[in-house]
Amino acid sequence: MIYRLKKNIEFIIVYRRGKSFANKTLVLYVLKNKRNKDKDGIAYSKVGISVSKKVGNSVVRSKCKRLLSESFRLNYNNILKGYDCVFVARNPMRDSDYFETEKAMKNLIKKAGLYYDEENGIKSN
């Protein structure tokens, strides 16, 4: 199950206290959160997605959000748990397809040191 950042204050905390990583199409803000645990005490990560009106009209913004959500969902098992992540779309994302979006997202997750390759048991930095 993918947990989401929903409240404005959650986004603000990640923006202010977290570290940022950027590439051409995305910006990633990451904050370690020790409180992200389910009933069984297992840690999980939360994701928030932000797409400004500068990126495009509502159709374009919605497409960007869907692409980011799907990329995160499919790569969730390869991301270290216990972090709050906020992805902010930049203008060039309006023209990118799913594969470019996923590549940009993986690039940022690896830059942040949160990517974990399950097959090889390797944490990427």
Curated annotation (Swiss-Prot):
Signal peptide: none annotated. Keywords: Endonuclease, Hydrolase, Nuclease, RNA-binding, tRNA processing. GO terms for cellular component: ribonuclease P complex. Consists of a catalytic RNA component (M1 or rnpB) and a protein subunit. HAMAP family: RNase_P (MF_00227). Belongs to the RnpA family. This is Ribonuclease P protein component. It comes from Clostridium botulinum (strain Alaska E43 / Type E3).
